[in-house]
Amino acid sequence: MTLDSTMACCLSEEVKESKRINAEIEKQLRRDKKDSRRELKLLLLGTGESGKSTFIKQMRIIHGSGYSEEDKKGFTKLVFQNIFTAMQSMIRAMETLKILYKYEQNKANAQVVREVDVEKVCTFEQPYVNAIKNLWSDPGIQECYDRRREYQLSDSTKYYLTDVDRISKPGYLPTQQDVLRVRVPTTGIIEYPFDLENIIFRMVDVGGQRSERRKWIHCFENVTSIMFLVALSEYDQVLVESDNENRMEESKALFRTIITYPWFQNSSVILFLNKKDLLEDKIMYSHLVDYFPEFDGPQRDAATAREFILKMFVDLNPDSDKIIYSHFTCATDTENIRFVFAAVKDTILQHNLKEYNLV
């Protein structure tokens, strides 16, 4: 065998090996591509306090491992802090709104609660329990609570304050509902992946306050579905960041921006009109027409009000070919979210069958 033929033989072996390696790489790339397509990215968007974090908690309860006793213990301090934060907000509002306490001793109780550094709260003991119970039962504080649209107050206030006896018992362990109701503003980006029918759903929650939104841009690649949350009950409220701007108008402006982004051209859009329970309560005394004069439906009618709000959002869609899927929700109601997400999952899978190699 000549040197040339030996070299040719070696070369052909090298070429063969190179081809084999390339083929293996190509095969792996195709496999990776197929696997990556079995992961669906769901982006949760909406303004602050629309219920995005509660929705993520529900996914953990419904499709994940839920909350163990140890997990729930971790929320104890946050529940206590939520109670103090709510009462301090109302005490400040009593002054701003010039509402008087009916019972003189509640001025002293208010002072006791006001002096607490909420960040350092990790227990809930006397004299604070009594002070908060007495304040909550004062007609002045109740009037202040009824006027909560005039200042910032957590939606969970009534839920916690009517249950102070249970929450202040020694050895208190938060219930699942207590965990769902805890308010902690989202800063940064929270991802929650869960597995459904061999497909990974990666839900991404980003902070809704204006200061958080500049971080969203990093999440915009390869989004399967936009899940946009609107709080139905915010039609008469103003922003935390700006007390002369209506929260629902802000939500509409954000939704209009999101659905026209080129990034989301191929993403399905699912609109959750959340806090339907709070709307049903609020619509009885706060009239939609006072904030949206174009509303010409009957007063105290939650069904008409929510359909009007839905239409306002759907009408913002400039693309007649793009369907906006919508659901009325109550994010603190596990059974409601279980039912709604089953429908959402079907929508997402139908929308992505071919694209994600699921057929």
Swiss-Prot record:
Residues binding GTP, per UniProt: 46-53, 180-183, 274-277, 331
Pfam family, one: G-alpha
Keyword Glycosyltransferase in annotation: no
Annotated spans, G2 motif: 178-186
GO cellular component entries: cytoplasm; heterotrimeric G-protein complex; membrane; photoreceptor outer segment; synapse
Region annotated G4 motif, chain positions: 270-277
SUPFAM superfamilies: P-loop containing nucleoside triphosphate hydrolases, Transducin (alpha subunit), insertion domain
Record has Transit peptide as a keyword: no
Region named G1 motif: 41-54
Annotated G-alpha domain residues: 38-359
Listed SMART domains: G_alpha (SM00275)
Family annotation (Gene3D superfamilies): GI Alpha 1, domain 2-like, P-loop containing nucleotide triphosphate hydrolases
PROSITE patterns to which the protein is assigned, alphabetical: G_ALPHA
Major site of localization recorded for this protein: membrane
Reactions listed under catalytic activity: GTP + H2O = GDP + phosphate + H(+)
Protein role: Guanine nucleotide-binding proteins (G proteins) function as transducers downstream of G protein-coupled receptors (GPCRs) in numerous signaling cascades. The alpha chain contains the guanine nucleotide binding site and alternates between an active, GTP-bound state and an inactive, GDP-bound state. Signaling by an activated GPCR promotes GDP release and GTP binding. The alpha subunit has a low GTPase activity that converts bound GTP to GDP, thereby terminating the signal. Both GDP release and GTP hydrolysis are modulated by numerous regulatory proteins.
Subunit structure: G proteins are composed of 3 units; alpha, beta and gamma. The alpha chain contains the guanine nucleotide binding site.
Protein name: Guanine nucleotide-binding protein subunit alpha-11
Species of provenance: Xenopus laevis (African clawed frog)
The gene coding this protein: gna11
